[in-house]
Amino acid sequence: MDSPCQPQPLSQALPQLPGSSSEPLEPEPGRARMGVESYLPCPLLPSYHCPGVPSEASAGSGTPRATATSTTASPLRDGFGGQDGGELRPLQSEGAAALVTKGCQRLAAQGARPEAPKRKWAEDGGDAPSPSKRPWARQENQEAEREGGMSCSCSSGSGEASAGLMEEALPSAPERLALDYIVPCMRYYGICVKDSFLGAALGGRVLAEVEALKRGGRLRDGQLVSQRAIPPRSIRGDQIAWVEGHEPGCRSIGALMAHVDAVIRHCAGRLGSYVINGRTKAMVACYPGNGLGYVRHVDNPHGDGRCITCIYYLNQNWDVKVHGGLLQIFPEGRPVVANIEPLFDRLLIFWSDRRNPHEVKPAYATRYAITVWYFDAKERAAAKDKYQLASGQKGVQVPVSQPPTPT
């Protein structure tokens, strides 16, 4: 990448943005698309993805993947991107790519606790950090790392050594990930993407367990909460199984859920007025690759208690141009589409309510994902009496995993 003012090469692979001289790729006026493509893994920076569109807008096609990336200067560090005036610009770093509205540079540059907007931080009762506290300040020399889990301190090396370092650093890593990355991203954008969440070793074991569930015939066609008059296969084409994580052959899935629980637990009290006291079982989902997807929908349109959606992807060597299966999110009130590729070891987090209508485009290869929804205590209690909940939600609330008691 040459400079923040000339974002290369990611911008060349993305559709033209509003106000550009080229003809827009979207059929509808006022629509831009936002891609998260061709990441270079980096444990130092969050995988921000910062979009939004009106919920009534229709879906577009997938965004082309970038064919090259750069390991030179990061515009995240150079303060490129943000929101001011509504002009969309691409933002890329080692491990993070987004399109955000021009301005709000310090948020993108500093990750958590941005200096701007200062009024927001004053309302939250906190002060902006000094530049020395930026996430990369103490670890700039580790940019060349290509492996790493949730821990920012994992050095490169063998898979076993990296996994050991990740597990050793877990007590502090979830808190850092939550406070520095997820909380600010969710506050400002309502969507957060984190690559290399578990690391290749544990992620591979989770994938093996999911494949075993499919081979064993454990997956069943996904059901609908409502719209019973419409054939389910015309709306959603996935096969699912609900897993708690302690079943035989599901130990690694349980470890994944414990990792996600740890991160969400550290977000508690920092994501609006939500009181998160539990979650669903893990929904293991497989699109068999026969051209089926999931039409645009909202996870929680009627207040059933779900407030946060977390999706973990398990698809190695996935090419959305060949395999399809793109997840598109249409954040409410902003004329852009978030294109999320279902890449291996990627964690996606977004609000479950009407703020984030989304759909899965037709998949032409086997596509795996694990989804869990976290409950807001008050809304969930009211929903139990008001609604007939789906079989995957009713009576399966699982307490958020607690850290082990020190011995």
Curated annotation (Swiss-Prot):
Domain Fe2OG dioxygenase: 278-376
Induction profile: By estrogen. Induced by proteasomal inhibitor MG132 (at protein level).
Documented effect of changing M1A: Leads to expression of isoform p40 only
Biological process annotations from GO: cell redox homeostasis; cellular response to hypoxia; estrogen receptor signaling pathway; peptidyl-proline hydroxylation to 4-hydroxy-L-proline; positive regulation of protein catabolic process; regulation of cell growth; regulation of neuron apoptotic process; response to hypoxia
GO cellular component: cytoplasm; nucleoplasm; nucleus
Tissue specificity of this protein: Expressed in adult and fetal heart, brain, liver, lung, skeletal muscle, and kidney. Also expressed in testis and placenta. Highest levels in adult brain, placenta, lung, kidney, and testis. Expressed in hormone responsive tissues, including normal and cancerous mammary, ovarian and prostate epithelium.
Transmembrane segments: none
GO molecular function: 2-oxoglutarate-dependent dioxygenase activity; ferrous iron binding; hypoxia-inducible factor-proline dioxygenase activity; L-ascorbic acid binding; oxygen sensor activity; peptidyl-proline 4-dioxygenase activity
Subcellular locations according to the entry: Nucleus
Region (Disordered): 1-34, 50-89, 108-157
InterPro entries: HIF_prolyl_hydroxylases (IPR051559), Oxoglu/Fe-dep_dioxygenase_dom (IPR005123), Pro_4_hyd_alph (IPR006620), Pro_4_hyd_alph_FE2OG_OXY (IPR044862)
Protein EC: 1.14.11.-, 1.14.11.29
Cofactor: Fe(2+); L-ascorbate
UniProt: 2-oxoglutarate binding residues: R367
Impact upon substituting R367A: Eliminates hydroxylase activity
Binding-site residues, Fe cation: H297, D299, H358
PTM info: Ubiquitinated by SIAH1 and/or SIAH2 in response to the unfolded protein response (UPR), leading to its degradation.
Start-end of Low complexity biased regions: 1-24, 57-75
UniProt catalytic activity: L-prolyl-[protein] + 2-oxoglutarate + O2 = trans-4-hydroxy-L-prolyl-[protein] + succinate + CO2; L-prolyl-[hypoxia-inducible factor alpha subunit] + 2-oxoglutarate + O2 = trans-4-hydroxy-L-prolyl-[hypoxia-inducible factor alpha subunit] + succinate + CO2
Superkingdom of source: Eukaryota
Domain notes: The Beta(2)beta(3) 'finger-like' loop domain is important for substrate (HIFs' CODD/NODD) selectivity.
PANTHER family membership: EGL NINE HOMOLOG-RELATED (PTHR12907), PROLYL HYDROXYLASE EGLN2 (PTHR12907:SF6)
Function in brief: Prolyl hydroxylase that mediates hydroxylation of proline residues in target proteins, such as ATF4, IKBKB, CEP192 and HIF1A. Target proteins are preferentially recognized via a LXXLAP motif. Cellular oxygen sensor that catalyzes, under normoxic conditions, the post-translational formation of 4-hydroxyproline in hypoxia-inducible factor (HIF) alpha proteins. Hydroxylates a specific proline found in each of the oxygen-dependent degradation (ODD) domains (N-terminal, NODD, and C-terminal, CODD) of HIF1A. Also hydroxylates HIF2A. Has a preference for the CODD site for both HIF1A and HIF2A.
Protein's recorded name: Prolyl hydroxylase EGLN2
Organism name: Homo sapiens
Gene assigned in the entry: EGLN2
